[in-house]
């Protein structure tokens, strides 16, 4: 049985979710999977590498060889203390969070598995042998929840979701349907008050979040950039009509056939990623188009989004298993 070690900072948010999804996908494909969740702390930075070196030495002395695993999968960051613990080392990077300090370790890697097609040339340009595996998201669909002709924006704690422009635009359109925004207190500058805006700043139970996701026909996800885009993909999974930026990698997931695209007005950069920003006029155009779309067409778009979600989930699980097997052979 092929032994795989998943390595990432267990932050309780996106990386923890990725660890869980990868663990389930690889376990279902008959791999022996270990999760090495890394915690923050100055003491950990000293003690953890020392423990790994001691364990590696003990394996050598016992005649078992230094490599406990066949493949290390490192999420987002290169973890050099683990390089000697596996026969093959792989990075699953996010362009927008790539740390330049990791460049010196790239020659030690056997492969990069990237989550979007947009990321392939980015990491090939760094000299990495790069393979598109894609990714998946949790299936949040609950067909028992009645759907409302309303809009939802899951801002969370991210500063890359285009939330401020969204709220400002909605305030100028009191005749638009209700917009519900969920945002972390760490990210919210203020709580917006308007007759057709419900701005919830704080944390809610996951069951309530799932209900809200399923209850809204429209999900607004105008991200500046995404490593993959769980909140876009979860929205498609519940059969919502999703609006996002007409820019990579967001428009890999959302197309006009299964959602709405917002034209970017300007660009910027964040690490290796290009960031995209929209203006009020572009959002107005996209929202008005959705509001003028028939219910039958909206239902068709939501069904197409759900179909894409299911197809993508199956394809990812097949690709990641095949990629790991080929590398470990």
Regions found by a protein language model. Give the residues of each.
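Extended catalytic core of nucleotide-activated donor transferases of GT-like folds
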Residues: 42-122
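Donor nucleotide-sugar binding/catalytic pocket of nucleotide-sugar-dependent glycosyltransferases
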Residues: 110-141
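N-terminal pre-catalytic "stem/leader" segment of glycosyltransferase-like enzymes
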Residues: 1-75, 314
